[in-house]
Amino acid sequence: MHKIMKIYNSSLILLLFFSFIFSNCENKGKNITTTFLSKNTTKNKLKNVENFDKNTQTIHVLVALCDNKYQGIVPVPEKIGNGQDPDQNLYWGAAYGIRTYFKKSKDWKLLKSEKKDSIRMERLIFQHISKKNYYLVADAYDGQYIKNCTADFLYSSSGQMKDVLTINNTRIGLYGNSRLVSYIGHDGLMDFQLSESFKNTDNQTRDCIILACYSKKFFSPLLKETKANPLVWSSHLMAPEAYILHDALAGYINKESAEQIRSRAALAYSKYQKCSEKAARNLLVTGW
């Protein structure tokens, strides 16, 4: 038993070590200035458009690009920590960023890539290879607008923000019209507060995945207002990389249980972070 506990403790320490190195979520007293455009002043104001093909299922992923300058993080190498350069960014164009990882996936086909605006620097639209009614839309938010990205995620989870887009003559839902909404990036709620109301407006429960450090602790108070269902989020420092979401979605699309989806996420984390499965399960949790 002593030997088993020693192995487990070593795995947990290793997990936390790698999480610290790669998550870069801890603010070491860093003074930051985060730009925030409120819903009343931004062009990206709240919409409530609901007319879309109800046979489609959208997964909308909002990514706050890693940003050494505008986020309260332990700095990463300059090349991958430029929040205004999605092509090289840790959470987008790097090897385990959303764009690179999903473009290489055998499960998803990239239909379109487009530049959006000064806040959402790029949008990707994927379609699932076998379950063709499933679409994944990923938006890369300029890192200095992490507050907008966080707010848009919560507005979407609550049903306050809804939109649509047309791809190959099919109109699919976005934001609150999505079946699942995901946030990926630094946990900005460790650095700032949001005073907006994210109260659910349509009595619908949306699924969500939040890949950010301590996301259960910091997102819980606001997420409860939205009535969303947290399928996967974190209990500690973590590296919010694309393979976690990718493998979790494989279970989600197959209509697996929340525990099975969480298990897929943990197994992926264990594999890529070289930590024990048990340690990964302690990090990536499901439900309240």
PLM features per residue range, with description:
Residues G29-W108:
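Boundary/activation segment at the start of structured domains
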Residues F102-K106, S157, M161, G185-G188, ...:
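Sec/Tat-exported extracytoplasmic proteins
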Residues Q260-W288:
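Caspase-like cysteine protease fold
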Residues P86-G173:
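Functional beta-strand-loop-alpha-helix junction segments that form "active/interaction loops"
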Residues I13-F20:
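Bacterial N-terminal signal peptides
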